[in-house]
Amino acid sequence: MKISEEEVRHVAALSKLSFSESETTEFATTLSKIVDMVELLNEVDTTGIAITTTMADKKNIMRADIAEAGVDRKFLFQNVPEKENHFIKVPAILDDGGDA
């Protein structure tokens, strides 16, 4: 299937892109080759072949939603350079502290 330069210009305009004449010609040629390659897939006999929607055999693999004890606070805070009221103190990243 041949993609015309006019079609390339039309899609470029819809996408708010601009191309030179040489780029438009090159895109038309390249896109035509891509479409031709994809159309070759229509010639493949897939009779009796199951439809494949994903290559992954497993779906929705998640751990059980079970509450577990967290890390001991003393252990967590032993390497913290600055802390205040059981919080880790970090440098401000907003000038005024922000509205958060």
UniProtKB/Swiss-Prot annotation:
Keywords: ATP-binding, Ligase, Nucleotide-binding, Protein biosynthesis. Pfam families: GatC. GO terms for biological process: glutaminyl-tRNAGln biosynthesis via transamidation; regulation of translational fidelity; translation. SUPFAM superfamilies: Glu-tRNAGln amidotransferase C subunit (SSF141000). One of its GO terms (molecular function) is ATP binding. Allows the formation of correctly charged Asn-tRNA(Asn) or Gln-tRNA(Gln) through the transamidation of misacylated Asp-tRNA(Asn) or Glu-tRNA(Gln) in organisms which lack either or both of asparaginyl-tRNA or glutaminyl-tRNA synthetases. The reaction takes place in the presence of glutamine and ATP through an activated phospho-Asp-tRNA(Asn) or phospho-Glu-tRNA(Gln). This is Aspartyl/glutamyl-tRNA(Asn/Gln) amidotransferase subunit C. The lineage of its organism: Bacteria, Bacillati, Bacillota, Bacilli, Lactobacillales. The gene is gatC.
